[in-house]
A protein has these predicted regions:
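Acceptor/aglycone-binding surface of glycosyltransferases and processive sugar-polymer synthases
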Residues: 4-20, 37-119, 145-155, 160
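Short aromatic/hydrophobic "clamp" motif used to bind/position activated sugar donors
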Residues: 26
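Conserved residues at the C-terminal ends of beta-strands
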Residues: 29, 57, 142
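The conserved acidic donor/metal-binding loop of glycosyltransferases
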Residues: 30-34
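Terminal low-complexity segments of carbohydrate-biosynthetic enzymes
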Residues: 48-49, 105-106, 159-187
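Catalytic donor-sugar/metal-binding loop of nucleotide-sugar-dependent glycosyltransferases
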Residues: 90-91, 115-117, 126-144
Length: 187
């Protein structure tokens, strides 16, 4: 068990856990198990096929959503996905599904670079993974909406948008360059 020094955000907690992980494959999942843990085998299979990172997706096969989000949350998710595409060039159907697996060496390469400590950490780690040439595979998984989420789309949505801009700024300013992430002129 890894303890955190207070509540510093989900991104901080995931980074802390991944940097302490010992297995060959490191997995994180939402605490509410929106994707059943049995779905982890799909992510492991993707890694065994050659992916460095396997990310669960709610949107590649929507029929796997056993309980859908309210429409306002779906709309927020689509808008955020479009913003990621424009600002960071990410082309994934779903970066925010809290079900991701990493080869340990891939996790050890990108999580030390992570700067975002709140909800916007997912696009940052995928942005970094792409920039250092890691292979990311998106995998459709079973998923059910949970009312217990702590994410508030309107309040946290603005913060997440600002975090996307911060990731772009960090890249342009060369904040990731020391760790081998391509320089801004190559972005």
């Amino acid at each position: 068990l890894v303890a955190n020094p207070g509540n510093r955000g989900i991104g901080f907690s995931v980074r802390n856990g991944m940097l302490h992980a010992r297995g060959d494959i490191c997995l994180f999942t939402d605490a509410d198990l929106s994707s059943p843990i049995t779905e982890a085998q799909k992510l492991f299979d993707a890694i065994n096929r050659g992916a460095d990172i396997a990310i669960g997706s709610r949107w590649l096969r929507t029929e796997l959503q056993t309980e859908r989000q309210p429409l306002y949350r779906q709309a927020f998710g689509r808008i955020f996905n479009l913003a990621q595409r424009i600002i960071l060039g990410l082309r994934f159907a779903d970066t925010q599904c809290g079900f991701k697996a990493f080869r340990r060496d891939a996790a050890q390469r990108i999580f030390p670079l992570q700067k975002i400590e709140r909800w916007g950490f997912d696009p940052e780690i995928l942005f970094l993974a792409r920039r250092v040439g890691l292979r990311v595979e998106e995998v459709p998984v079973l998923w059910a909406h949970s009312e217990g989420t702590r994410l508030h789309p309107f309040r946290d949505g603005l913060r997440m948008f600002v975090e996307l801009l911060r990731i772009r700024w960090n890249a342009m300013a060369g904040d990731y360059a020391a760790a081998g992430v391509p320089s801004p002129e190559k972005l």
